[in-house]
């Protein structure tokens, strides 16, 4: 039997854009190599750079699993530096960001550890990231119980994005996505906000507090942003609801002008997660003349490369 202490030795650490400065020219190396996946990285980098200069509405869309990794700090930094001005993500993002902002520590592990043993040791496994029980559910429950009553005292009904700003305001961790979003007033849109520990705890507390979340106001906000922008672009990392919500709303302005997908999903099963940009064109979610790229690979490798290229 492995000791718990032996597994929980090496914590996951957040990175910032400054950590990538020495790699800012790495895409030029891939441009020389060019073949196969290298071309996608080069094309995606060029599109991102043009999008950031040209599009006034810039979506950062990603799934929650990435927030358990060191990409969390990088996402926060991309927001703080103004590269993106709206986030669309999933409920677990809020869980991981809050947990890690208030003392939760995640650790480096392995995909191959015995999961029954981990359960006995009170450790969750998220891929090869280890999440001790005490770093997750309990932390989030305590945060919601502490802050929601004071938020609800002034606001009996609140849009979800404003609620997340309220929590972000109460975070001091510089690596926090919610903190960065609050500071820059970047809305964090979570269409599936009830799906996770944070959402469940909101539901539980709502039974004791006169408090409601108005998701229609989130829809009104994203509608106003899409309808009023001149051009829109998106970096979409992963699939699922965060990907679909991003491209869904852009159909009402005849589609995204720029789109970069980072994914491991394939299109043969007809899934939204695996669908390429060309399929979104048929749904009016990406313009026929839009600049787009699909990069296949692990986001923990691809995203730092793309982010580094923005510094060159």
Swiss-Prot record:
Alphabetical list of Gene3D superfamilies matching this protein: Deoxyhypusine synthase
Pathway(s) this gene product operates in, as recorded in its UniProt entry: Protein modification; eIF5A hypusination
Catalytic residues of the enzyme: 285
Name of protein: Probable deoxyhypusine synthase
Source organism phylogeny: Archaea, Thermoproteota, Thermoprotei, Sulfolobales, Sulfolobaceae
InterPro entries on file: Deoxyhypus_synthase_arc, Deoxyhypusine_synthase, Deoxyhypusine_synthase_sf, DHS-like_NAD/FAD-binding_dom
Keyword Transferase appears in the UniProt entry: yes
Function: Catalyzes the NAD-dependent oxidative cleavage of spermidine and the subsequent transfer of the butylamine moiety of spermidine to the epsilon-amino group of a specific lysine residue of the eIF-5A precursor protein to form the intermediate deoxyhypusine residue.
Family label: Belongs to the deoxyhypusine synthase family.
GO terms, molecular function: deoxyhypusine synthase activity
Highest taxon, organism lineage: Archaea
EC number: 2.5.1.46
Enzyme class of the recorded protein, top EC level: transferase
